Amino acid sequence: MLLDTHRRIVCRALAVALISSCVVLLTACRTDRRIVLTASVAASLTDAIQAAEAAYTQAHPEVEFRNNFGGSGALAQQIEHGAPADIFLSAAAGPMNQLDDKGLLVPGSRRDLLRNSLVLIAPLQSTLSGFDQLAGPAVRTIAIGDPGPVPAGLYAQQSLTAIGLYNTLHPKFVFAESVRQVLAFVETGNADAGLVYATDAASSGKVRVVATAPALTHDPIVYPAAALRTGAHPAAASDFVAWLASPAARSLFTQRGFTMAAQ
């Protein structure tokens, strides 16, 4: 009787140990299959890309995303100097061309993904009614992105130059590190006006669109995307970039005010 009891206890202990070992092995296998994609993303894509990533991971649960948001020019510089990244989504062709010229893109992965427009915004209570009023005394500060690293700032510079206001308004400029910072300056009243993308303005309930910059006054606002050769998972990154042009992703972008670039 005692021997049988002892045997049963030993068998149960062995069974528990075996099950525990299997659980550990299965967990380890799942962990080994996990793919972490690091994406360097233009700040104006913050909301849209997070929605796209959430949709993608539903169909690809093994994939996890880590995002680095900022001005496209600054992100390109970081990547060029060795910052870890699998994917780059830029708000202008220039920063992407910079990496392409260095041979840092996965061949065939680059695509023009989205389009946007540039708008003049002001706080809700502002009486500003057009670009022509920016030079008046009621407007003391105007937020724009730094034209060097921030594509929205370059587009703003081009547009204001084309309509003959850039040099006149220069003393009023507050330069921001990203288009989202421009939006924040206007939202908080730290700037009387600002130039941002239409999608950024639409995401805020604290500003209003005063006017849209004429499209011919600045370069076309196109968002290219590409997988990076220096990333840890170039194949998975290329798959995600291709998926961003799919009908499922397209609806997520258009819901947020973007238009799709012609493929």
Predicted region positions:
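Periplasmic-binding protein-like
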Residues: 86-90
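Twin-arginine (Tat) signal peptide motif
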Residues: 2-15, 21-28
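Exported/periplasmic ABC-transporter solute-binding proteins
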Residues: 29-60, 64-69, 73, 77-81, ...
